[in-house]
Amino acid sequence: MGKYFGTDGVRGVAGADLTCELAMKLGRGAAAVLTGSTGHRPRILIGKDTRQSGDMLEAALTAGLCSVGADVESLGVLPTPAVAYLVKKYNADAGVVISASHNPMEFNGIKIFAGTGYKLPDEVENEIEKHIDNNCADIPLATCAEVGRVSVRADGLDDYVDHLYEAIHGDLTGLNVCIDCANGASAAVAQKLFPRLGAKCTFLGVSPDGANINKGVGSTHLDNLEKAVVAGGFDCGIAFDGDADRCLACDELGQEMDGDKVIALLALAMKEKGRLDGDTAVVTVMSNLGFIKYMESQGVHTEKTAVGDRYVLENMRENGFAIGGEQSGHVILLHHATTGDGELTAGKLLKLLAESGKKMSELNGIYAQYPQVLVNVTANAAQKAAYKEDEVLAGFIENEQQKLMGMGRVLVRISGTEPKIRVMVEGQDLEAIDRCAKRIVERIEQRILKQ
């Protein structure tokens, strides 16, 4: 991670950490790095989620881009994966998404896609950061007719829905589904796509007001969806986050289906049809041991990366694998998309359910998960830095790992998108791992929270 860019773009509290000044510099730096050698007037797409701060940041970002001669096409509110798809379809030089994904509304973020539709590699982000630190002093400003123009593009929604419809290529007739759009960017797409595929749909979280994105709804608040599914007698529930790059589900009994379960089901379906390249699924170190063991028993190898869908994608592209993702619900289907796409994932999962003739609870029960305890410790940048340098703390955590005697594992990591240190302990004995997690959290708080 760099000074400004985390694992998923630049992110922070809008107006405090992520200011208009920073957004403008980011626009200038990105335009210079991404389009400096194109030899033509660059075109940049901008999409956003439903946060109140999105308009403010889009205006600042647009000013930065236009000030160095780039034309901007505003797509309005669209999911992150829609921008990734459209930047390539429209032959644009880059695409920018203004969103903080699953975070509360006070946060916002800026993530950038190259003209290929893929997120920027670390080295390109580092070049942009150098320009920001230099106040973009070495980037010439456009004048007169060289200044970029701004236009609104209204066809993005329908073009993206058409793409998803063709990629899913399924008939969902007979399914009764409850879909939670998190009061975010997925609402317009979902309300067009899933009924078109034949599903009977009831929608939650489709009334964004700028402040209610992810507020008690969406993939980070599944309890409301789970209750609604049981009370309404739905076949299953689907939940997206604020920018719809992730998808979680629940079965008809209200039981959660995390990203591991979704990846397992889709990967095995692909394997059965001969489409699972390398018979491999790429996941992160957070994936459940029950998932890993089950996939191995089914002849599917699992590649494990650091946490972050960008690292999953890098492994997939380097090795030619077709599916990967995270327990949190990011699922990348590389035959159809260049990034995690919640609505594509949901469509593929619902197609599998419709074709199986089974209940979702039967699909959800394909393997038993090992118990996991996940605790988040709030930590600012200085406290995160102190954690990384604390050898005593590292030794304590290693000792806790040894106490599990090979019957579990400990994973403590710094979040790249939130001011948190995440403590995850996994094993067969829930009481033992719960005690272990509490000891680690207590020691972290004792040693670094004074920073």
Q: What do the PLM-derived regions correspond to, one by one?
A:
Residues 13, 108-232:
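Gly/Ser/Thr-enriched, mixed-charge loops and adjacent short helices
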Residues 82, 126-161, 166, 252-325, ...:
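Proline/glycine-rich low-complexity loops and linkers
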Residues 236, 273-451:
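Phosphate-binding and adjacent anionic-ligand microenvironments
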Residues 47-48, 179-181, 251, 335, ...:
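Short glycine-centered, acidic/aromatic-flanked micro-motifs in structured strand/loop junctions
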Residues 1-63, 67-68, 150-175, 384-385, ...:
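An N-terminal, well-structured beta->alpha segment
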Residues 39-49, 73, 176-178, 279-285, ...:
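Short glycine-rich phosphate-binding loop at a beta-alpha junction
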Residues 32, 36, 40-108, 192-250:
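N-terminal small/polar loop signature for handling phosphorylated ligands or for N-terminal nucleophile
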